[in-house]
């Protein structure tokens, strides 16, 4: 993997983080009108249906250019398996996140971003090498998370968010495994259908929201479904093809910074001094993990 492709992947994932950051505000507003599981199920179906024409048009363009290669039965099986696995992990993570988002957009995002710790830890069990600078960046990220959240006793919504960060780490590693093997748009589409089916099935037992309530949070659903799901999660799958899961998770954890900024700009939530410092430290962690190792080695050679 070249430095150019790694940079490309990082930039795509930073854009993903921006889109996700704003989605915390939409989720926070949306769950005021309908149940968290209903919100997550509906937005997932919206994201899935939005991706169908994208997948079709992409294939038609390839056919027209003569670059289309019909997938084998094995590739289709891998795509379906990947979509189901990613969907189950994402369903668990995003549902827990939506259930805990009433902790506030900024706090929710930064607790969720603890997946930057779980990804390299889980990666060790998968025999993935993690550079020392990444562990330093992870520690910086944890310090940033502490500052942004402050000293607090865990509430139920915060427990939901910590659990969701664990499953987001599982989702990132699952995407890392399947994304190089299959079409990214199709993988994203299938995973959202899986999320929608699971959550909407649960919704039938918990209570179906009224049409009026769904319409009242229509704007939040549109952003969360089209932008956060269809666009951002597809960008995640594409971006992770060009970077390691640990570096990718650190780039995506910038969503916490953008969530705080979105809460400030859209909801008028004023940033406290410790929150600003925390944002800066998390951003520094993202930059650190992207610095090539060669820079430090060359500097040491010059000094000697």
Residue map of PLM features:
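C-terminal transmembrane-helix exit sites in multi-pass transporters
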Residues: 50, 55, 114-135, 257-277
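C-terminal-most transmembrane helix of multi-pass membrane proteins
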Residues: 2, 44-45, 59, 217-219, ...
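Juxtamembrane helix-entry segments on the extracytoplasmic side of multipass membrane proteins
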Residues: 5-10, 33-41, 72-79, 150-170, ...
């Amino acid at each position: 993997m070249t430095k150019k492709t790694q940079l490309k992947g990082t930039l795509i994932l930073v854009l993903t983080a921006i889109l996700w950051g704003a989605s915390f505000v939409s989720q926070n507003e949306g769950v005021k009108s309908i149940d968290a599981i209903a919100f997550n199920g509906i937005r997932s179906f919206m994201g899935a249906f939005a991706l169908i024409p994208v997948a079709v048009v992409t294939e038609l363009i390839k056919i027209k250019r003569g670059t289309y290669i019909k997938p084998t039965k094995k590739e289709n099986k891998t795509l379906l398996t990947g979509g189901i696995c990613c969907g189950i992990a994402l369903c668990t993570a995003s549902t827990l996140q939506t259930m805990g988002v009433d902790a506030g957009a900024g706090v929710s995002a930064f607790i969720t971003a603890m997946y930057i710790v779980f990804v390299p830890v889980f990666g060790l069990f998968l025999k993935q090498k993690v550079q020392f600078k990444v562990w330093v960046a992870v520690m910086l990220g944890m310090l940033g998370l502490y500052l942004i959240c402050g000293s607090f006793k865990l509430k139920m919504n915060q427990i939901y968010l910590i659990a969701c960060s664990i499953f987001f780490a599982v989702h990132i590693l699952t995407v890392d495994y399947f994304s190089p093997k299959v079409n990214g748009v199709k993988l994203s589409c299938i995973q959202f259908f899986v999320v929608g089916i699971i959550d909407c099935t649960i919704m039938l037992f918990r209570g179906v929201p009224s049409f009026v309530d769904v319409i009242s949070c229509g704007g939040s659903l549109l952003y969360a479904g089209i932008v956060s799901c269809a666009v951002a999660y597809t960008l995640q799958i594409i971006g992770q093809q060009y970077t390691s899961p640990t570096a990718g998770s650190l780039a995506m954890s910038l969503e916490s910074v953008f969530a705080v900024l979105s809460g400030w700009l859209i909801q008028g939530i004023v940033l406290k001094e410790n929150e600003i410092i925390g944002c800066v430290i998390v951003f520094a962690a993202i930059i650190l993990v992207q610095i090539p190792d060669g820079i430090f080695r060359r500097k040491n050679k010059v000094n000697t």
